């Protein structure tokens, strides 16, 4: 039972089977927020981390890999406290990656942008572990998302992680068919590995037309 509101949908097995038939990669999303201190408590408990890593590894065998979306780390932290938050999360990611690689499963991280209010993510260290990183360059406050801040986030990420490992996260509810083309243009300008869209079900036909005209789907 999900505590964050995102449930595994009915018929998910059929979706996975169809993805396999079309030679499409699939990822299991593991999503937790730290609003109530859940993540902080987890990262302070080595036994709990090991149990979670093992559970994720077992479940992930049905997928091509895992998309780890641990949100909210580092808010109001600074100095040594912030550094400890970053180290603990990096340690967890390293443990998870080791477990996943025993079954040749991939690891994607969905991270708050480097210029967000949540600095608890060491992009350089995480970029050396994960296969891909999604820069969640949204929730800056205004809509469409401000181009200057999105581009700044990409520049900051590229200074620490090879561009081909980075995907620009785009929140469809924050964009229009016109503005989403601008965001895709930023990803292209910096030679990123691609874009990641949040989420299916809220991307309108105008956006799809823009995406089809500007992107090549990779399986």
State each model region's role.
Residues 1-219:
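Secreted glycan hydrolases and related glycan-binding modules that recognize and/or cleave
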């Amino acid at each position: 039972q999900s505590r964050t509101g995102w449930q595994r949908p009915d018929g998910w097995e059929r979706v996975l089977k169809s993805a396999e038939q079309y030679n499409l990669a699939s990822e299991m999303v593991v999503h937790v927020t730290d609003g109530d201190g859940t993540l902080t408590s987890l990262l302070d408990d080595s036994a709990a981390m090991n149990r979670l890593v093992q559970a994720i590894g077992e479940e992930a065998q049905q997928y091509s890999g895992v998309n780890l979306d641990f949100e909210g780390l580092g808010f109001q932290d600074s100095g040594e406290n912030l550094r400890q938050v970053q180290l603990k999360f990096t340690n967890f990611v390293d443990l998870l990656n080791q477990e996943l690689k025993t079954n040749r499963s991939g690891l994607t991280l969905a991270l708050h942008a480097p210029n967000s209010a949540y600095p608890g993510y060491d992009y350089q260290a995480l970029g050396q572990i994960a296969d891909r990183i999604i820069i969640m360059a949204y929730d800056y406050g205004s809509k469409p998302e401000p181009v200057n801040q999105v581009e700044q986030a990409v520049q900051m990420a590229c200074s620490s992680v090879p561009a081909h490992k980075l995907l620009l996260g785009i929140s469809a509810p924050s964009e229009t068919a016109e503005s989403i083309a601008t965001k895709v243009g930023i990803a292209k300008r910096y030679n990123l590995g691609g874009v990641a869209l949040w989420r299916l079900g809220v991307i309108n036909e105008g956006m799809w037309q823009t995406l089809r005209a500007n992107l090549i789907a990779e399986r």
